[in-house]
UniProtKB/Swiss-Prot annotation:
Record-given protein name: Dicer-like protein 2-2
Keyword Nucleotide-binding in annotation: yes
Function of the protein: Dicer-like endonuclease involved in cleaving double-stranded RNA in the RNA interference (RNAi) pathway. Produces 21 to 25 bp dsRNAs (siRNAs) which target the selective destruction of homologous RNAs leading to sequence-specific suppression of gene expression, called post-transcriptional gene silencing (PTGS). Part of a broad host defense response against viral infection and transposons.
Residues annotated as domain RNase III: 889-1033, 1075-1258
Domain of life per record: Eukaryota
GO biological process: defense response to virus; regulation of defense response to virus; siRNA processing
InterPro entries: DEAD/DEAH_box_helicase_dom (IPR011545), Dicer_dimer_sf (IPR038248), Dicer_dimerisation_dom (IPR005034), Helicase_ATP-bd (IPR014001), Helicase_C-like (IPR001650), P-loop_NTPase (IPR027417), RNase_III_dom (IPR000999), RNase_III_sf (IPR036389)
One Gene Ontology cellular component: cytoplasm
UniProt similarity note: Belongs to the helicase family. Dicer subfamily.
One Pfam short name: Dicer_dimer
Length: 1362
């Protein structure tokens, strides 16, 4: 006979106030046992173990020990939260890392609830002591084994203190339904680890059995009449083929392993689903996984500069799959595996009214795949509403993990819906096996999972309603035999512990408006941020206020309300059209008794959607640029980067390793003199020809040409001696005859015999007397050196008759010759101060001006080495410096080529691009940086636009501006380590000495740092990208940009080509006939008509929910147009300098010029009018009308419509004058253009049209080039280039005319005519020119500057400025 006892807890801490517990005798039996010793309570699932724990807690609290508290430990976050909600005083989550926080949290409490890990960390850090606790409760105590954190608590802390004699340790209470994990032998292990003994009710065991409903166990085997699903899904088959071809590409095993990590794991999971569930499920899983992965990668592309080779490689591989086909809604029998068909059959048979079931599977991926299959299969789709559960641990895969589609944030909601009955089936892993409170089920299925005794008992325990069933789908005939063995083991366990099932009473739920208003919220687990319903309206208004502001546009949310037949309200909120159509309209989730509540609910639903779209961050404030940058990023004006790469360190190492040697032919071309031919020998190969200008004087330039190397075998010792001989001619003080291990060798010949002959012939010196007696010619003379006093060597110039006088007698004491001192210069790479010595009489000689002078023969001796080799030694610092730069460029080329399809050809451009501070190459560098800047803006704008289709233009612009700023680009270089390639060291010729292998310091693990300005680093990045474009075109530049700036992805346009972006476009935005006229005007036919509509939709159009406004397309189109202009200028780069190109770009892309284009661009069409007079005669009249682009503008602002019409009407005459100046007067009318006024909407639609055509044409620039031609931008640009028409801004021109003078402008209002302004242009406070007019400040300043320029060029106003 069953009996029970009522136990009332009156406002006891740790329990719900006035909570009534119905206590059964077997529970009291367990309570009494726990008061005697450390105990593990073993009772079946659902029989009230938690009540035993509560009784034990209350008994402990009743002792009145105010200094101690009870700690309840749970294995999972979900379970600990569940226990906290029902009974606890304080729930302690993870992450508190401050003792003060712990002390404050535990102050005055009686019960603490946490996971095992939280307590273990707190004990390990010393934040909490076991002596503070009176009772330690382990829920799901069977986990206390091996390396489980529950066992660590006992072994590391409890047992260790117990063995050391500590007395005041807490009592232990364990709770479990099955004290074993695998077999019966683990029982004693658990008891030993917890220092407790397992007990189960004995005296009241019969009563325990009365509260247990055991399900009918039904083992099932598949009938293999269904075709075997051994064929792979088409996507899987295609992906296998791509990977097979990729395996043939040579690559290092380490790199290949990194690249294939993600894609192979995904393949293994997909193959497992293909085998377990069949083709349909595998196809659906792969298709959705790939789409989710691509979208996540695009959304996160700009967040970090750290490359993930595996994910980037996976992205590139998956892009090659092309457009993925949707699964067929009609599932064919051959698309289902036999085991899965068996599962579907059993599910359909088991279904009855009030069905409530679980399906256990092995893999996380199988959970979703099976859910989709059940929801789409004709046998089950109409019977089940499915949810999924995989656990609440926050240690989940990244959002960009290929194959990870689970969102743990939705799982609490899944359990809640299951309890309410809106879901009747959950697909799960072992996460729902134990602990978490779910309603009693009437059907549980185990699908192809190997059961242990523990999992058998736990899963069967979930089916505890009356007449429930536990269906086990088995693979083969061995399954039933194994099941029998488990049942026998359970009988043995029951005999030992008298175990049975448990039952939980679900918590009561309130269902009225006030409670719902309090309970509805948006919670962010990561940050703890929470938005409750009553605050949602304020948050939504704040979000809208952060959207880009624009005239005639209200960014406030608009609420409307509906009242149903029962007097309850629903609200709809409409958000500004700057947002994506999917984010423009939201309804309240239910009807409410008060209009205020409906409004708050709609606002909350809107804010949830904005958060899911990434427009609100984890702190529930509008997303900022910083949210998409690394957390610790700080943009600075200067960055500490690695020291400049020293290629001589590698050269020195190669010399020491006796590597293959390469000879490079070196020619020095000397105008009006013989060329010098040598060989430079290096242990590495330069694979490009290097041209090195050597500036001798203002009029003379030599050219050193170093050709690609070829392998040689030669006597190194001889080569070193020859090199030493050449170097000693100039660097005698730095050259030793003992240490000859030069980093490079210079020799005139490669044959050993000729080298020996060279040494024998030219080593040493000879007296001048002896040389003159041999009647040697000056060209054969070496350097003259004085015996008597230290001085620079002398060069003997070629002479003509009469310039050298030699006496007839043999004993010569003096002679006259044309000589000069050898120059001190060692740097011939720059003009230096040569310009100051400009002369009309230029001589191509090394040294000072030669003079005829009389010299004592005895005072001099002569080097046997001809002086031309001394010239080579003089040029060597300059040549070796350029070789060093090219070697650095060659190493950088190798890094860039890893991602480039096209091999680099112009390494000379790369050598210039890495020298941002070089004066000699400044013009070319600026040209490359100019090109690279525009190209990166174009690419990044496209990437942001495509990857973040839900982001508004303000966020896109901010992120682009921040990332492509000098600091953003510099930070990328700083992180990537590519800063070592930047050349900041200039040649110091006077300190140069021949480099020795023994004197070169080896590379150190601790790289030295140097401070470089952010602008310098950014300029290098742009120039390298510009060099890539100049060398190999768009593809090479894009690949290079992705290396220099890793946030810029080489696959940034993939969503256009695989159909992903097209799925984000609105359907049926407008009938195609509505834009035919617009297409005819533009000369372009849109494939996606919604793009044409969007490009003409003003932000004032709120509530259409068809497209977003044109702001996003305008953002993209501005960069596209800029690149079109820059690429056109690049094709004419030979005829203009970078400053001129920058001026032209500004002139043809600024907003006022685009406004002018919008006003003047039109098409004249004929219209036929049929009139019928009173006599019924038909008259046909033909009239003409002008179709203009702004005629198609969609707007909802009467004020803007009126102002736009007035503006166009007033500007028509001004536009004609501007057109005349542009085409006829060959003059860029800055003043007239600016005077047109600021009608931003017109320039915006020009840019948005470029953006629309670019996207519609699949990022085809040719279509945009044609549009620029059609609009008249390219013809006008060509006109300005061919006629060399200046486009410099008047202010810039005035400042250029007056270098060093301070130019300023003074504006005052005419006192007689208050509407008139007077502006004076001043140079150092002296007036140059003044103008008057009725215009704004900016225009009148431009007019004053223009007038001043005109006067100065005509010679006026010079006296005032002199």
């Amino acid at each position: 006979m069953t009996s029970s006892t009522d136990y009332h807890a009156d406002s006891t801490p740790g329990t719900t106030s006035n909570m009534e517990l119905r206590i059964r005798e077997y529970q009291l039996e367990m309570l009494n046992e726990s008061l005697k010793r450390n105990l593990i309570v073993v009772m079946p699932t659902g029989t009230g173990k938690t009540q035993v724990a509560i009784l034990r807690i209350l008994a402990d609290i009743d002792k009145g020990n105010s200094d101690k508290f009870v700690w309840l430990l749970c294995p999972t976050v979900a379970l600990s939260e569940q226990q906290y909600i029902q009974y606890a005083t304080v729930f302690l989550p993870s992450g508190a890392e401050d003792k003060a926080i712990w002390d404050n949290a535990l102050s005055g409490i009686k019960i603490a609830v946490s996971t095992y890990q939280v307590l273990y960390d707190a004990l390990s850090h010393g934040f909490v002591k076991l002596s503070q606790m009176s009772l330690l409760i382990f829920d799901e105590a069977h986990h206390c084994k091996k390396d489980h954190v529950a066992n660590k608590i006992m072994q590391v802390h409890y047992h260790k203190q117990h063995q050391s004699g500590v007395q005041n340790l807490p009592k232990i209470l364990g709770l479990t339904a099955s004290p074993i994990l695998s077999d019966l032998s683990s029982l004693e292990i658990v008891e030993s680890n917890l220092g407790s003994i397992c007990k189960t009710p004995r005296q009241y065991y019969a009563q325990l059995l009365q509260f247990t409903n055991r399900p009918l166990i039904l083992p099932r085997l598949p009938t293999y009449t269904i075709p075997n699903c051994s064929v792979k899904a088409p996507i899987l088959e295609k992906l296998c083929g791509i990977l097979s071809s990729e395996d043939e590409v040579p690559s290092s095993s380490k790199m290949k392993s990194k690249q294939l990590k993600h894609i192979r794991r995904f393949m293994q999971t997909s193959e497992s689903i293909n085998q377990e569930l069949g083709i349909w499920a595998a196809t659906e899983y792969m298709r959705k996984s790939i789409m989710h992965f691509k979208e996540s990668m695009r959304m996160g592309a700009e967040k970090t500069n750290i490359s993930n080779y595996g994910k980037d490689f996976a992205m590139e591989i998956l892009t090659r799959l092309g457009k993925l086909q949707d699964c067929s809604p009609a599932i064919q029998p051959e698309e289902i595996s036999p085991m899965c068909q068996c599962l579907l059959d059993e599910l359909s048979k088991a279904y009855r009214e009030g069905f409530c079931g679980l399906v256990f599977v092995t893999q996380r991926a199988t959970v979703l795949a099976l859910k989709w299959l059940i929801e789409n299969h004709p046998l089950t789709s109409h019977l089940f509403t499915c949810g999924t559960f995989i656990g609440m641990s926050t240690t989940q895969y990244s959002k960009t993990e290929l194959g990870n589609l689970h969102d743990i944030r939705n799982q609490t909601e899944t359990l809640e819906k299951f309890r309410q009955g809106s879901l009747n089936l959950i697909i799960t892993t072992d996460a729902l096996e134990e602990g978490i409170d779910v309603p009693a089920c009437n059907t549980v299925l185990n699908f192809n999972c190997q059961l242990s005794l523990k999992s058998f008992i736990q899963r069967r325990g979930r089916a505890r309603r009356e007449n429930s069933q536990f269906i086990i789908i088995m693979e083969d005939e061995s399954g039933p035999r194994y099941l029998k063995r488990l049942e026998m083991e359970e009988i043995e366990l029951v005999q030992k512990l008298q175990n049975a099932e448990r039952r939980q009473i679900p918590a009561n739920e309130l269902d009225f408006d006030k409670y719902e208003r309090i309970s509805l919220s948006l919670d962010i687990d990561r940050t703890g941020a929470q938005l409750i319903m009553r605050e949602a309206v304020g948050y939504l208004y704040n979000f809208c206020s952060k959207l880009p502001a624009q005239l005639y546009v209200s960014n406030k949310p608009l609420f409307t309300y509906e009242r149903n037949n029962y007097g309850r309200f629903r609200a709809v909120v409409k958000l500004p059209s700057n947002l994506d159509p999917s984010l423009q309209s939201f309804s309240s989730s239910r009807s409410w008794s008060r209009l205020k509540y409906a409004r708050e609910d709609a606002a909350l639903q809107a804010y949830k959607a904005l958060y899911q779209a990434g427009l609100v961050n984890d702190y529930l404030v509008p997303t900022q640029v910083s949210d998409h940058l690394e957390g610790d990023i700080i943009f600075r004006s200067h960055y500490s980067i690695q020291n400049q790469l020293d290629p001589w360190q590698d050269i020195a190492l190669l010399w020491k390793l006796d590597s293959q040697l390469y000879a490079h032919n070196l020619r020095i071309i000397r105008p009006e003199e013989d060329e010098i031919h040598l060989h430079m020998i290096l242990p590495t190969q330069l694979d490009t020809t290097i041209h090195i200008p050597l500036f001798i004087d203002y009029c003379t330039t030599y050219t050193a040409i170093l050709t690609p190397g070829h392998p040689i075998t030669t006597d190194i010792s001889l080569c070193q001696q020859v090199t030493n001989l050449i170097f000693q001619s100039v660097y005698r003080d730095h050259c030793s005859r003992r240490n000859l291990d030069y980093a490079f060798l210079l020799v005139p010949e490669l044959e050993e015999t000729k080298l020996i002959e060279f040494l024998e012939r030219y080593s040493g010196s000879v007296s001048l007397t002896e040389l003159l007696n041999q009647e040697a010619t000056p060209s054969a003379l070496g350097l003259l050196r004085s015996h008597t006093r230290p001085s620079r060597p002398l060069l003997v110039e070629p002479w003509v008759a009469g310039e050298c006088f030699l006496p007839d007698e043999l004993s010569i004491s003096s002679f006259d010759a044309k000589v000069k001192y050898m120059t001190n210069r060692r740097n011939f790479l720059s003009h230096g101060n040569l310009a100051a010595g400009k002369s009309t009489n230029c001589e191509a000689r090394i040294g000072l001006e030669a003079n005829v002078k009389s010299m004592s023969v005895r005072d001099f001796f002569v080097d046997k080495l001809p002086s031309m080799f001394a010239q080579v030694a003089l040029f060597t610092p300059s040549i070796s410096h350029e070789v060093e730069v090219y070697m650095i460029a060659q190493i950088l080329r190798q890094e860039l080529s890893l991602r480039s399809v096209t091999p680099w050809q112009r390494i000379d451009l790369l050598a210039i691009a890495i020298r941002p501070t070089s004066i000699e190459h400044r013009a070319t560098f600026r040209l490359l940086a100019f090109i690279g800047d525009a190209f990166m803006k174009y690419l990044f704008a496209m990437q942001l636009f495509l990857h973040h289709h839900l982001w508004h233009e303000g966020l896109l612009s901010s992120l682009k501006q921040r990332n492509l700023s000098d600091a953003g680009l510099a930070h990328a270089i700083h992180q990537s380590g590519l800063g070592k390639f930047l050349i900041s060291k200039h040649l110091n010729g006077k300190r140069w000495v021949p480099p020795l292998v023994s004197g070169i310091e080896p590379a150190s693990n601790e790289a030295r740092q140097r401070s470089i300005g952010a602008a310098t680093l950014a300029d290098m990045t742009k120039a390298v990208v510009g060099a890539a474009f100049t060398d190999g075109g768009l593809n090479q530049a894009a690949a290079c940009a992705s290396v220099m700036f890793p946030k810029l992805k080489s696959w940034n346009a993939s969503s256009l080509h695989d159909g992903t972006y097209s799925k984000t476009r609105p359907e049926n935005a407008v009938a195609s006939t509505a834009i035919v006229d617009m297409e005819e005007l533009l000369g372009y036919t849109f494939t996606d008509k919604s793009l044409a509509v969007e490009s003409m939709t003003h932000p004032s159009c709120t509530g259409l929910v068809q497209t977003t406004s044109y702001r996003r397309l305008s953002f993209l189109g501005a960069s596209v147009l800029e690149w079109i202009v820059v690429s056109y200028l690049h094709r004419h780069a030979q005829v203009m300098n970078p400053q001129r190109m920058q001026s032209l770009k500004s002139a043809f892309t600024n907003n006022t010029f685009l406004t002018f284009i919008a006003i003047t661009f039109h098409q004249v069409r004929e219209q036929n009018h049929i009139d019928v007079d009173d006599e019924h005669n038909v008259h046909k009249n033909v009239t003409t009308c002008s179709i203009r682009l702004w005629d198609f503008l969609r707007l909802h602002s009467d004020a803007l419509s009126t102002e736009l019409s007035d503006f166009v009407q007033k500007s028509s005459e001004k536009a004609d004058a501007i057109k005349h100046e542009l085409w006829e007067q060959r003059f860029y009318p800055w003043v007239r253009l600016r005077a047109l006024g600021d009608m931003r909407v017109l320039s915006d639609i020009i840019q948005s049209i470029f953006g629309a055509v670019f996207i519609d044409s699949q990022a085809t620039l040719a279509s945009c080039d044609a549009l620029a031609e059609k609009l008249g931008i390219v013809p006008l640009l060509e006109h300005f280039i061919s006629h060399q028409i200046t486009t410099d801004h008047p202010k810039d021109t005035l400042q250029a005319i007056l270098p060093g003078r301070k130019v300023s402008y003074q504006i005052c209002v005419d006192k007689v005519h208050p509407g008139t302004l007077r502006c004076s242009a001043l140079a150092d406070s002296s007036e140059i020119a003044s103008v008057e007019g009725q215009m704004n400040d900016e225009v009148i300043k431009m007019q004053a500057a223009e007038t001043a320029v005109r006067l100065l060029r005509k010679g006026f106003a010079l006296s005032e400025t002199s």
